[in-house]
């Protein structure tokens, strides 16, 4: 890092991994890469990038918003011509399918400030991807994997678990990063399902879950008033009493409710 004399930018959510052991663990979790095109978001100084390339992917596309950091990768680009390329862009606005061919795996230490928005974007085009191996702030990972009746369970949990198998692999202490963040991080693996667990319109489900979890302490009968004019019919068809609170419903029950609104 000292070689480039670049200070990480808090505005871009930059926290770089110091430990090569951690980068190895992350890439090993992604499994075989030789037959896959890989996307990395925010390669930074290249610690994770080098480890990905060491596992011989079919190709690696790195997306980096910081123009100064893009310049740090000239040596890697020369060493891996035809296999590694870096695009200077905001990952939130990149159209991945225009830049890379399937099959695609994503391996990334996601910038804190865009991690949630980026994951939601990917969920909406989930069939493009084979697997994700991702590092989030622990609190975001907690929300993704949360189960019913837990404090972190919400709209993000429902949508993620409808579309994917998700597993928390390990947590990482702040001391393993530069600069040192104030929070722990978590690495999760995400495997998109061939089809949704339950048949449901995703737009209707998202509208429903966001509305009721915005009033998560209210009983469903009350929180649904702002979502549908068929509250009682929807509850009856979904076999719900209306006295439940949003956190009590399973993913399947949310899908039944959305289908009957």
From Swiss-Prot:
GO terms for molecular function: 16S rRNA (adenine(1518)-N(6)/adenine(1519)-N(6))-dimethyltransferase activity; RNA binding. The keyword Methyltransferase applies. This is Ribosomal RNA small subunit methyltransferase A. S-adenosyl-L-methionine binds at residues 15, 17, 42, 64, 90, 109. PANTHER family: DIMETHYLADENOSINE TRANSFERASE, DIMETHYLADENOSINE TRANSFERASE-RELATED. GO terms for cellular component: cytoplasm. Belongs to the class I-like SAM-binding methyltransferase superfamily. rRNA adenine N(6)-methyltransferase family. RsmA subfamily. Its main location: cytoplasm. Its EC number is 2.1.1.182. Transmembrane segments: none annotated. It catalyses: adenosine(1518)/adenosine(1519) in 16S rRNA + 4 S-adenosyl-L-methionine = N(6)-dimethyladenosine(1518)/N(6)-dimethyladenosine(1519) in 16S rRNA + 4 S-adenosyl-L-homocysteine + 4 H(+). Specifically dimethylates two adjacent adenosines (A1518 and A1519) in the loop of a conserved hairpin near the 3'-end of 16S rRNA in the 30S particle. May play a critical role in biogenesis of 30S subunits. Keywords: Cytoplasm, Methyltransferase, RNA-binding, rRNA processing, S-adenosyl-L-methionine, Transferase. It comes from Wolbachia sp. subsp. Brugia malayi (strain TRS). CDD domains: AdoMet_MTases. It is found in: Cytoplasm.
């Amino acid at each position: 890092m000292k070689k480039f004399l670049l200070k990480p930018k808090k505005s871009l959510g930059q926290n770089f991994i110091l430990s090569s052991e951690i980068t190895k663990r992350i890439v090993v979790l992604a499994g075989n890469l030789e037959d896959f095109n890989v996307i990395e978001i925010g390669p930074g100084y290249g610690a994770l990038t080098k480890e990905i390339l060491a596992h011989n992917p079919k190709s690696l596309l790195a997306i980096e918003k910081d123009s100064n950091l893009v310049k740090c990768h000239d040596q890697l680009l020369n060493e891996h011509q035809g296999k590694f390329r870096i695009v200077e862009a905001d990952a939130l606005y990149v159209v991945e399918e225009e830049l890379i061919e399937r099959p695609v795996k994503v391996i990334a230490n996601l910038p804190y400030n865009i991690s949630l928005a980026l994951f939601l974007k990917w969920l909406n085009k989930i069939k493009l991807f084979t697997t994700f191996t991702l590092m989030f702030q622990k609190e975001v990972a907690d929300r993704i994997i949360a189960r019913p009746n837990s404090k972190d369970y919400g709209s993000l949990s429902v949508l993620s678990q409808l579309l994917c198998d998700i597993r928390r692999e390990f947590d990482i202490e702040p001391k393993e990063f530069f600069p040192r963040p104030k929070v722990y991080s978590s690495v999760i693996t995400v495997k998109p399902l061939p089809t949704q667990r339950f048949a449901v319109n995703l737009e209707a489900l998202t509208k429903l879950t966001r509305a009721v979890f915005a009033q998560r302490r209210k009983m469903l009968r009350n929180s649904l008033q702002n979502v549908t004019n068929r509250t009682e019919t929807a509850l009856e068809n979904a076999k719900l009493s209306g006295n439940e609170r949003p956190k009590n419903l399973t993913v399947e029950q949310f899908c039944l409710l959305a289908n009957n609104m």
